[in-house]
Amino acid sequence: MKKSLIALTLAALPVAAMADVTLYGQVKAGVEVSRTKETVNHVSTKNKTATEIADFGSRIGFKGHEHLSNNLNAIWQVEQNTSVAGTDKGWGTRESFIGLEGGFGKVRAGKLNTALKDNSDSVDPWESSDANASVLQFGKLKRVDERKVSVRYDSPVFAGFSASAQYQPRDNANPEDKHVHDVKTRHSFDLGLNYENSGFFGRYAGTFAKRKVLSDDHLELFNSNTTLGSGVYKDYQAHRLVGGYDANNVLVSVAGQYEGFKADVADAKKNERTEVAVTGGYRMGNVMPRLSYAHGFKAKENGVKQGNSQYNQVIVGADYDFSKRTSALVSAGWLKEGKGGDKTQSTAGLVGLRHKF
């Protein structure tokens, strides 16, 4: 009898050791079609319609915790992209961290979402491939979203209010300069403030960097007709306010965003842009139809407003839930940048499937 009890205890030990580990993820993909029409000096040209099987951001992750003492836990997560097209590789390519959580809130270190990235879902619930994210998602608005190798503190919730603060050291922002420090620091700070009560919510997110590298892709999303080139810019900042209501089958969300930065030279003038977006939806049984609209006001480059830099975007679609885990997706998007005889119009649509586990 004693031997049987010992054997049962030993057999249960691996199960107990793994009890705090959770495997989770999403598999989502479908068919996308897209096309672009460009007008220059009132002469229009269209490219061929592209039709492709596309991954919509499939991912897999492992997370867990260990109880250390009264009201204190060790927490960890490792998450990575896993495209159904087999194009992703590597571990920890998404939010991955280790940290401590207790009555004080939580402190984490690793590759972490910024507050800006965290609050995007409040106004942009859409799915698509990266290639069509600027049409089928608010890709232009979300150009400021990042994950940074950093340390982040999240406060507990007090009467509906919570906050976060995040810091990326200079040698994580620019690892090629480590131990040398030949160039000026590119460390950054991120802040988040949130409020939720009875379905109503308000969220602020901001990022600040004395100097920051901006890529050609980022600058093209900033202004598709930009005169700016990739490189280091100074006094970088981005701010987003999101407010709305999400309860009782109703979703209404409004966002406003500002981004500003200067060339890293003396007496440089600001490059800046202001954008707004709104999303509405109403659940009817298993169906959640939604409609979104975004507008980008004219961008300023070197302090001068850029003609034909404004944009308008519309996304319409619906999710149909087969179950709590599996949903069918359908959406269509339209993006117009510029106006009159000089403009670019992009259209795209998708039909797909999403499964969460």
UniProtKB/Swiss-Prot annotation:
Domain of life (superkingdom): Bacteria
Signal as UniProt keyword: yes
Keywords: Cell outer membrane, Ion transport, Membrane, Porin, Signal, Transmembrane, Transmembrane beta strand, Transport
Annotated membrane topology: Multi-pass membrane protein
Protein family per UniProt: Belongs to the Gram-negative porin family.
Subunit-level organization: Homotrimer.
Descriptive protein name: Major outer membrane protein P.IB
